[in-house]
């Protein structure tokens, strides 16, 4: 059986289709329909029993789902008012899914593991900021790339079971030292209410900021897709304004 995905011209309906090469028959096993658009991913993962893992925004947030081989929903693996921002894969030996999400705040990223039935969820990264993972082929280890608004990228080798740090690969300590020698203000995160919605924002004040004085304001904003600008991560360019 061959699987394929089709998207209509408006990009708001995606069909997951199975094609049987022996019978030359096709069947639509799953439909994704949205008023605006449907994101395409490479997250489709087939299991030994021909069931499959799928990610979808159908409940308003991007989450992980487990479907039977005929497209019947078995269970929603992750759920909550937060997004799964990266699906790393599935380890069939221990029945575990690995993913990145916003569960620790929408400006942060953490790496998690969870069993296929939605239980035994573990946060594998401990530092608040942006964490990303590159897993070994057998999901035994992962290299964690961590940074924050004040911490340059830190690379560690971690245990995929509990997140234990086996080894620090690169600290960027020299960069940290160099940056500390400059009198730069820290990035301040907060929210602003626009039309009833709390939107994330950040502000960098002058190093000698005086609340009694008025200062010119420079605003930076970009609304391209998949381009979150307010994030607790290291920015080696724009933060030097």
Question: What are these regions, as identified by a protein language model?
Answer:
Residues 19-43, 68-91, 102-104, 114-131, ...:
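Multi-bladed beta-propeller domains
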Residues 9-14, 23-31, 226:
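Hydrophobic helix-coil surface modules that form long, contiguous segments used
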Residues 12, 25, 40-43, 52-54, ...:
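Extended, hydrophobic alpha-helical segments in both membrane/secreted and soluble proteins
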Residues 130-241:
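Serine-hydrolase catalytic core recognition
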Residues 15-17, 63-65, 110-112, 154-156:
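A short loop-to-beta-strand structural motif that recurs across blades of beta-propeller domains
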Residues 3-4, 18, 28, 45, ...:
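Structured core elements
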Residues 95-97, 108-145:
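Repeat-solenoid scaffold signature
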Residues 3-10, 17-20, 45-59, 67-68, ...:
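Beta-strand C-termini and the immediately following turn/loop, strongest in propeller blades
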């Amino acid at each position: 059986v061959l699987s394929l995905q089709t998207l209509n011209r408006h990009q708001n309906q995606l069909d997951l289709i199975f094609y049987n090469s022996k019978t030359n028959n096709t069947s639509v096993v799953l439909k994704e329909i949205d008023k605006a658009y449907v994101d395409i991913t490479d997250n489709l993962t087939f299991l030994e029993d021909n069931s499959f893992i799928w990610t979808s925004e159908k409940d308003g947030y991007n989450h992980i789902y487990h479907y039977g081989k005929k497209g019947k929903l078995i269970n929603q693996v992750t759920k909550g008012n937060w997004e799964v921002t990266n699906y790393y894969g599935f380890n069939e030996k221990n029945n575990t899914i690995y993913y990145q999400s916003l569960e620790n705040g929408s400006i942060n990223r953490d790496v998690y593991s969870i069993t296929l039935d939605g239980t035994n969820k573990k946060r594998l990264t401990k530092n608040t900021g942006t964490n990303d993972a590159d897993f070994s082929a057998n999901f035994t280890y992962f290299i964690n790339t961590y940074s924050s608004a004040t911490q340059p990228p830190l690379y560690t080798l971690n245990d995929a079971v509990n997140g234990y740090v086996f080894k620090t690969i690169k600290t960027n300590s020299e960069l940290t030292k160099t940056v500390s020698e400059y009198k730069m203000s820290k990035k301040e995160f907060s929210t602003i209410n626009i039309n009833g919605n709390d939107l994330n924002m950040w502000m960098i004040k002058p190093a000698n900021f005086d609340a009694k004085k008025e200062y010119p304001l420079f605003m930076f904003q970009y609304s391209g897709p998949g381009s979150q600008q307010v994030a607790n991560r290291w920015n080696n360019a724009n933060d030097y304004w």
